[in-house]
Amino acid sequence: MSSPYNRGSRHLQDRFDTRRLADRLDEKFLANPVIGAEDRAFIERMEMFFLATADAEGRPQCSYKGGDPGFVRVLDERTVAFPNYDGNGMYLSMGNLLENPHVGMLIIDFTSARPSRLRLCGVASIAESDSLLAAYPEAQFVVRVRATQVFPNCPRYIHRMDLVERSPFVPRADHETPVPDWKQASWAHDVLPARDQGRER
């Protein structure tokens, strides 16, 4: 397997004397990208993550993805899946996946007594007819990510936070999802998709 480190990484590792440490971390965590039992439990209790993507020219996007706990599902030791819910219609991150499927997922637990985080990198695919779609009310499609790297990340700079309230905008079964304020703005009402025309808060 090729090294996960590029020339830039190696340059800085040598500059700050961390090459040996980086090689050990590669051997211990990166060489075998398996989602273990602890990783699975961590992923499936989280209600948010950050998604990094880039287009065909390498221009990046980073987006926040939120849902109820368990909205990211571990399908097997190398695959996770999550829904794409209604957004602002720009499809910056999801559009990138159609041009460049390589993604990074940063999953952080801010609220536990000992905050922690997990990185999962992989290759993503989009399916509008995915068998999981029925499990996600109002989801437009399902994204599956085949992991190429799975590893815990140093938690020391994570600020501990409290969850005050889960978003009422997360689609849920037997619950009418409210309309966000911005869809009621005068600049937006005549360009909303047909499914949103006439809806009120």
What positions do the PLM features span?
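Binding-site signature for planar aromatic cofactors or substrates
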Residues: 1-201
